[in-house]
């Protein structure tokens, strides 16, 4: 038996060989990553890539995520997808070959997207070689082969979701596309493990927010018009109840003149009514004025006094005094009525404001309790499935 055969027959030799290959692959990955960092082009005279990396990291941090870098050795796409799928990138060659095999089986789906001057056989043969850069066709093939969705993060751009199946609630793999040529894996901000990533984009929240915004924009105009009409009708009714005036146009004119101040409108309407009553009283000619116009007839010693006695004279004077006193007494009564109306209106307005504040507090409490209940349900669902929801501001589906 030769030495090689003896070495192969020893127990544990296979595991040691696999361990050695794994370490060799890791060293090659570290060297490729260092070389890729040194050879990255610096746009704008230097520091451009570092600035892009910092901006990208801040963008992901706002979503509770971070970059897990993989070497830029031409295998970065399959390394990033493998890290998401398995928790490490050591099986990138296997993922590459499986993707190429799927593209060959589904040739009619992928051949139209190959460049015209390159035959399909040559394209897939080149893609099967380690270190060959893979593009969108490989991502689509990988997603369909594994029946999952791939979400691509880019700097200052919406998320791209490549759907590998039409099923809902399927697994998602999140990768980052940087520098126009490199892919990295995306992880939770505190995830340093070698476990598979479980990230799920909250597209439902995004669509719900968009529909809510459209509904608010649609109903805002109608609600504002209805509210304004209700407020005007309510103000007119209050002025009508306080003054007894049934002239709708007159009340509206006074409300507009007083800038819809209900108390000022009530005072204005009462003054106008008082002026109308004064004019009517002047046109009726009070009895005192008639007595005065009769002149000597009712004076002492006149014909009326001799015929009816001084009683008629006293009655005429009394009636005249009543007529003279009535305007001042009526003014006092109107002032008292105005004070009562104003106080009543003020109390009613205070009661309405208090009721409105109570309704506002009740609505806030209901919204808070509903939001806390929804957050509790979501936290329970995350704890059961161990999936991290990724918020997003915009998304594009492929």
From Swiss-Prot:
Q: Give the species this sequence originates from.
A: Homo sapiens
Protein name from the UniProt record: OTU domain-containing protein 3
Compartments annotated for it: namely:
Cytoplasm; Nucleus
Q: Where is this region: Disordered?
A: 1-50, 305-383
What gene name does this entry carry?
A: OTUD3
Biased composition range(s): Basic and acidic residues: 16-41, 345-381
Domain UBA-like positions: 230-270
Q: What does this protein do?
A: Deubiquitinating enzyme that hydrolyzes 'Lys-6'- and 'Lys-11'-linked polyubiquitin. Also hydrolyzes heterotypic (mixed and branched) and homotypic chains. Important regulator of energy metabolism. Glucose and fatty acids trigger its nuclear translocation by CBP-dependent acetylation. In the nucleus, deubiquitinates and stabilizes the nuclear receptor PPARD regulating the expression of various genes involved in glucose and lipid metabolism and oxidative phosphorylation.
* Gene Ontology MF: a single term: cysteine-type deubiquitinase activity
> Which EC main class describes this enzyme?
hydrolase
Region listing for Variable-loop, in residue ranges? 127-137
Location of region: Cys-loop: 70-76
């Amino acid at each position: 038996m030769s030495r090689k055969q003896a070495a192969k027959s020893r127990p544990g030799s296979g595991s040691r060989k696999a361990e050695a290959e794994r370490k060799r692959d890791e060293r090659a990955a570290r060297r490729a990553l260092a070389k890729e960092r040194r050879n990255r082009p610096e746009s704008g005279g230097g520091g451009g890539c570092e600035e892009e990396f910092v901006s990208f990291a801040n963008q992901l941090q706002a979503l509770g995520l971070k970059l897990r870098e993989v070497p830029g050795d031409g295998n970065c796409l399959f390394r990033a997808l493998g890290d998401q799928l398995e928790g490490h990138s050591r099986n990138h060659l296997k993922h590459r070959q499986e993707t190429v095999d799927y593209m060959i089986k589904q040739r009619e789906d992928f051949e139209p997207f190959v460049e015209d001057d390159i035959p399909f056989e040559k394209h897939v043969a080149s893609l099967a070689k380690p270190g060959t850069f893979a593009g969108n066709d490989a991502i689509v093939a990988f997603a369909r082969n594994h029946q999952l969705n791939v979400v691509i993060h880019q700097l200052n751009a919406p998320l791209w979701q490549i759907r590998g199946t039409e099923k809902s609630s399927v697994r998602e793999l999140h990768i980052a596309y940087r520098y126009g040529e490199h892919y990295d894996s995306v992880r939770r901000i505190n995830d340093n493990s070698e476990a598979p990533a479980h990230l799920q984009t909250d597209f439902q929240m995004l669509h719900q927010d968009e529909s809510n915004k459209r509904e608010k924009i649609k109903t805002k105009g109608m609600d504002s018009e209805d509210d304004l009409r209700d407020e005007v009708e309510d103000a007119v009714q209050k002025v009508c109840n306080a003054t007894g005036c049934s002239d709708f146009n007159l009340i509206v004119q006074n409300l507009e003149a007083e800038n819809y101040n209900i108390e000022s409108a009530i005072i204005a309407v009462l003054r106008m009514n008082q002026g109308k009553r004064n004019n009517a009283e002047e046109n009726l000619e009070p009895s005192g004025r008639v007595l005065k116009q009769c002149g000597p007839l009712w004076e002492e010693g006149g014909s009326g006094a001799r015929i009816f006695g001084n009683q008629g004279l006293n009655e005429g004077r009394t009636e005249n005094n009543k007529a003279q006193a009535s305007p001042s007494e009526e003014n006092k009564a109107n002032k008292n009525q105005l004070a009562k109306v104003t106080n009543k209106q003020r109390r009613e307005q205070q009661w309405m404001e208090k009721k409105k504040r109570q309704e506002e507090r009740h609505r806030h409490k209901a919204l808070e309790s509903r939001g806390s209940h929804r957050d509790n349900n979501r936290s329970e669902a995350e704890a059961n499935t161990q999936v991290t929801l990724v918020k997003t501001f915009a998304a594009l589906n492929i």
